[in-house]
C-alpha cells in the first residue's frame, strides 16, 4: 500500500493507492478551512459538505457562533443561501509542510472581525496529520490559540429543548463534524466519560466520543484535548452533527491581550482499539 501527501490548488491532501484518504481545503468561498472528504481506509466517506439543509456546514470545520454579538456561523441573509455571515473569518497566512512519509503539518493565521471592520480576535492554528499506517489508519490533531485584540465574548444560541424527549438544539460553536447521513445512521456512539447515545452525551460529555460501524468495526474517535470548563459535546439526535462546543454551558469572555487554547484529535481506525 502506497500513500503520498500532495499540495493542491486550494490546500493539501493524502492519496493512498489512488484514492483520497483525506483532503484539507484552505482557500474556500466561505474563508473557513475545512476537511472534506475524510475517508475511512476502506474508501467510505465520513463527512458531508454543504448539505442542502444547512449549506454553511462544511464537513469538518471550525466556526465561532457569535463574538460580541456578531454572527459568524451562518449566512446573514434571511434566506440563509449566501456564504457571507455578519462576521468575517479571514485566513491571513498559511504554511504547509509535507513529509516524505505522507505526514503533513499546516500552520494557519486567521482573524475574526465584523465585516469590513478591524479584527477583534487573532488565531494561530496548527494542524498535524499523521502518516497513515500500513492499514491506512491516521490521526488529525488540531491546535487553536486565540488572542483577543479587544475585550470579547464568545457566545452561542442557548441550549433548548428536552433530551429526554429526543428534541434539543442550541449550545453549538467551534470545531464541528457534519457526518454523511448514511454513515451517521449506522454509527453507534459511546462517550469516553459518560453516555452511549446522543441524548446521554449531549451537554454532559467532556472528553470525547467513539463512533463505530458495527458491521466492519471501523471507528472514528473524536477527542477534546483542551477546552474551558464551559465546553461540552453536542450531538444531533440523528448523529449527523457532532460538536465539542467550548461555550455550551455559557458564554466565554476574554480580555484584550488574553489567550484561549482549544485542541482536538480525530483518530480514523479500521477497527476498535487500534
Question: Where are each of the predicted segments found?
Answer:
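Short, solvent-exposed beta-strand/turn "edge" segments of beta-rich domains on protein surfaces
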Residues: 99, 129-139, 154, 164-166, ...
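Active-site/ligand-binding surface loops and adjacent short beta/alpha elements
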Residues: 151-227
Amino acid at each position: 500500500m502506497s500513500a503520498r501527501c500532495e499540495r493542491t490548488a486550494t490546500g493539501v491532501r493524502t492519496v493512498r493507492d489512488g484514492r483520497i484518504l483525506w483532503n484539507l481545503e484552505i482557500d474556500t468561498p466561505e474563508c473557513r478551512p475545512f476537511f472534506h472528504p475524510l475517508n475511512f481506509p476502506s474508501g467510505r466517506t465520513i463527512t458531508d459538505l454543504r448539505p442542502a439543509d444547512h449549506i454553511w456546514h462544511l464537513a469538518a470545520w471550525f466556526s465561532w457562533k457569535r463574538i460580541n454579538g456578531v454572527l459568524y456561523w451562518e449566512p446573514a441573509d434571511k434566506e440563509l443561501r449566501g456564504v457571507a455571515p455578519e462576521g468575517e473569518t479571514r485566513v491571513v497566512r498559511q504554511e504547509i509542510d509535507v513529509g516524505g512519509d505522507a505526514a503533513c503539518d499546516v500552520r494557519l493565521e486567521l482573524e475574526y472581525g465584523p465585516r469590513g471592520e478591524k479584527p477583534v480576535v487573532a488565531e494561530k492554528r496548527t494542524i498535524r496529520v499523521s502518516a497513515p499506517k500500513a492499514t491506512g489508519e491516521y490521526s488529525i490533531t488540531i491546535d487553536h490559540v486565540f488572542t483577543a485584540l479587544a475585550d470579547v465574548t464568545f457566545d452561542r444560541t442557548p441550549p433548548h429543548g428536552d433530551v429526554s424527549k429526543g428534541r434539543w438544539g442550541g449550545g453549538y460553536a467551534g470545531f464541528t463534524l457534519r457526518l454523511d447521513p448514511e454513515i451517521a445512521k449506522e454509527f453507534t456512539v459511546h462517550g469516553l466519560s459518560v453516555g452511549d447515545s446522543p441524548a446521554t452525551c449531549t451537554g454532559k460529555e467532556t472528553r470525547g466520543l467513539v463512533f463505530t460501524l458495527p458491521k466492519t468495526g471501523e471507528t472514528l474517535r473524536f477527542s477534546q484535548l483542551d477546552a474551558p470548563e464551559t465546553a461540552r459535546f453536542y450531538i444531533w439526535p440523528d448523529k449527523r452533527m457532532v460538536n465539542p462546543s467550548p461555550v455550551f454551558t455559557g458564554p466565554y469572555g476574554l480580555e484584550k491581550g488574553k489567550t484561549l487554547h482549544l485542541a482536538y484529535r480525530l483518530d480514523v481506525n479500521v477497527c476498535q482499539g487500534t
